[in-house]
Amino acid sequence: MSSSSSSSLPTSSASTTTSSITSRPSASHHLESILSSSSSSPSILSSLTTQSTSSIPTSSSSSSQRQSTSNADRPVSPKPMPTPTTLSEWQLLAVLSKANLVQYYDVFIAQGGDDINQIMACEEREFLEIMNLVGMLPKPLHVRRMQRALAEYSQDQTAFNLAALQQIGPPPPLNYTPAGTDPMALLLPGIAAATSPKFPSLRFLSQLSSVAEKVSTPSEAADTSSSSPSLNLNTTSSNSVPLAFKFSTPLLESLASDQQSSSTSSVRSVLPSTSSNTSHPELPAGILPATTTNVSAAVPPPSSRATANVFSGNSIGLNFSGAASVTRHLVVPPSSTSIQQPSTSFGRSSSITGQEKEGSSSPFLGVGYSQPYGNDFVSLGDFDPNNPSLTENPTLSTAQISRLAECALAASKNLPPLPPRLVQNKKRVSKEVIELLKCSPATPSMIHAFRKYSAIYGRFDTKRKPHKVLTLHETTVNEAAAQLCLLVPSLLTRRDELFPLARQIVKDAGYNYAKSRKRPCDPADLHSPISSPGNSPPPQESEFDEQPSSSSGAFKEEERPPIPPEAWAAIIEKMKGELPES
């Protein structure tokens, strides 16, 4: 029994092993059949391939969207400011930076448009051609911004250049000016003279450039602009512009020491001459030169009430440091030694009377003091302003013209160098005025031409009623403007500054004009309530505009030899025999 069971176990195990062995080829055969069937049906593979390939662009597109979103969120680094290599390129960059059009700088340089004066002197058609060359013409708003920046540059180049220093930094200090020429004198003619000989402006620009290179980013420069000291070469000037970078301590110390030494030397040079009046024979008795610091502290701020196209804050430079080097002539009061407080506005006292009289404080003859001349200007002549003529303009006497000439001479000594302007009120200077700038007023015909083109009221190129005569004050202002233009001919092209100067000279001469004074009764205006004698309108704005010129040639500034002081006495004597233009 046991033998039979034992014999059966090997048989069963052998059969099991045999069956398992035989089952393995069947499984492999089954796998081969599946592969053969899948190869025989390519539609399944194609569908799988299509589905997998269709899912790939979706994932790639989503990843590209995520990448673009991350790039958009990433801050874009600002384009670096172009680096000018010459003075003209720096001036072009200053104008474009003011108009926020720096992207056109490279195009301007490539087209040869680095001369701002050439762009300003061209006519409208030429200007539009230039705008077309640089690609600005299709964008009218950019052209308008460019025009506004050029207009602001033409009004006051010194203030414009000061503002450009804090925006784009100083110009390159080397290889852009002729030999022996001071670069700061070209950019800031009124401020370059404030630096002493030991600290020339060329060295000042070099140190300024080295300090500017330490500023890493524009944002850091903007953050430090509020806390950085300001470039205030004149401590009394209200138009100081803070620079957009920090000064180093040695630079500040050297600048302060140079200012102190220059002011001390100017005081020492002036003090010996204050003991007597023999060194200034051209000045009237009682007028002595005073120190620069007293004048700077006593100059009143410009008035907010502007006249004759003079806007608020656009004074002609009485606060310029360049004018500080010129000796100021002040009137020493005979009995008073205390200095009064200056008036609150230019030409207006702090207490205004009911008649609105203009103040008597003068920045030329008596800052803070009483009038050098009493209110006797009208009594020097034969014309009575209370009984004016209805058909003839007033005529000034020889004594009145001589008084105006003396006040104009004292005023001209306190003015900074004023270069002529090619464009004023968006109009070019006429050829006749340019010819007057080239010659000296030594003949009666030249004096007559100066009176013609310096007139403020009743000009030949304005629309004025032919029957409307001038008042005595208007005639006096015209004569004061002519006397001042004889001494400073460039004021013929700077009429917005000539008008307030002429009015101040009239007040210095002793003519305190009351604004409420009525005009003479005009029969032609009796039926016109707008132009009645009691409500006479101010002069039209067109009366202060310069006559447009028909020529398009560029004006070349020629250096004229200065007229010696002793020659002006003979010219003033000739002026006494001349009558003002009727």
From Swiss-Prot:
Q: How does it assemble?
A: Interacts with transcription factor lin-29 (via C-terminus).
Positions of region (NCD1): 83-161
Please list the GO terms describing molecular function: DNA-binding transcription factor binding; transcription coregulator activity
The region called NCD2 is annotated at 396-519
Q: Where is the composition biased (Low complexity)?
A: 1-70, 257-276, 333-345
What UniProt keywords are attached to this protein's entry? Answer: Nucleus, Repressor, Transcription, Transcription regulation
InterPro entries assigned to the protein according to its UniProt record, in alphabetical order: NAB_co-repressor_dom, NAB_fam, Nab_N, NCD2_sf
Q: Which GO cellular component terms are attached?
A: nucleus
Please name the taxonomic classification of the source: Eukaryota, Metazoa, Ecdysozoa, Nematoda, Chromadorea
Where is the segment annotated Disordered? 1-84, 257-287, 333-365, 516-582
The protein's predominant localisation is nucleus
Family, according to the entry, reads as follows: Belongs to the NAB family.
Record GO biological process: exit from mitosis; molting cycle process; negative regulation of DNA-templated transcription; regulation of development, heterochronic; regulation of DNA-templated transcription; regulation of vulval development
For this entry, the protein name equals NAB transcription cofactor mab-10
Q: Write the gene name.
A: mab-10
**Subcellular locations according to the entry:** Nucleus
